[in-house]
Amino acid sequence: MTYTEIDEQMLHQNFHLLTEFVETQCAWMNIICDEEKWSALPWWTRLRLALGGTFRSQADGLEYVRWEGDQVDECGVATTQATNAQTTLRLYHWWTVARPFRDDPWAMVEDYDILDTLAWEKRRASVIHQQESQRAWELEAAQTQDDTDKLVELMRIRSSLWT
């Protein structure tokens, strides 16, 4: 088991809950609210679900959240439910698609031996390493701030995550 800081665990656990919400609860709503989809499920799947099993489908979950995000009131204005669903969709996409493929800030920094700074001919390498490290720290700080902003955004819509 690898050690992970609490702040990282907090981020992962909360976005895991968002993922579960979309892929199970919203997917379930998409199936049970559509007679055609429900009927298209194999009988053994319907039986398992009727006995309390869990239904998971990313496609059905996203379809339901998109439908929810398109809801408007009688004046054609997006409802609060729709606005929250749009935020849910955006956060889900960020967590499952964008964030996993962002750059590793420390990949650009070469492994470096601190003892190299003692050798005169290695001082230039030391300066380059310090510059690379500074850029990595800045990128890591920006990514951490992005993570925090998204986590705060998730907390703002948490009361809307129900079906």
Locate each region found by the language model.
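Long, non-globular targeting/processing and low-complexity regions
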Residues: 1-157
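Long C-terminal interaction/binding lobes of large macromolecular proteins
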Residues: 163
